[in-house]
Amino acid sequence: MGVTKKPDLTDPVLRAKLAKGMGHNYYGEPAWPNDLLYIFPVVILGTIACNVGLAVLEPSMIGEPADPFATPLEILPEWYFFPVFQILRTVPNKLLGVLLMVSVPAGLLTVPFLENVNKFQNPFRRPVATTVFLIGTVVALWLGIGATLPIEKSLTLGLF
């Protein structure tokens, strides 16, 4: 048997909070044992039942067996590796390519130190961080799109 706390509605601080919609839920049921013992197992068992039902109704196919002699001409990685793949593909020296990849997190680590005087959270009032983000996004998209093209068109994206 849970003990529920009754609010003191004569308290002016609580009345001001309730008027603004900031009060706590004093009128509801306690979370223990009602939520944890009754509602959570229903949600968990319902999720498991949905997963089992989908697995029975729509099983995923295993696919064709792998044929090592029938590989494509150019193997592409997953989409999230496209920028890294493009760097390694276009830079002639592999050590330079690895150093370029290491320089990205190193450059991102320096941004807070470059802008440590600026305490604003608004991105329009933090020009260094906003510029680094925009340039990094454009470069990542450029490299990602270029990785899907042939090597001759990959740097210019076929525009020039």
Curated annotation (Swiss-Prot):
Sample GO molecular function, one term: electron transporter, transferring electrons within the cyclic electron transport pathway of photosynthesis activity
The record's annotation in Gene3D superfamilies points to: plastocyanin oxidoreductase (1.10.287.980), Single helix bin (1.20.5.510)
For this protein, the record's CDD domains field holds:
cytochrome_b_C
Q: Which UniProt keywords apply?
A: Chloroplast, Electron transport, Membrane, Photosynthesis, Plastid, Thylakoid, Transmembrane, Transmembrane helix, Transport
Lineage, top-rank taxon, reads Eukaryota
Q: Has UniProt tagged this entry with the keyword rRNA-binding?
A: no
Q: Where are the transmembrane segments?
A: 36-56, 95-115, 131-151
Membrane-protein topology: Multi-pass membrane protein
Q: Where in the cell is it found?
A: Plastid, Chloroplast thylakoid membrane
Cite the HAMAP family for this sequence.
Answer: Cytb6_f_subIV (MF_01344)
The identity of this protein, by name, is Cytochrome b6-f complex subunit 4
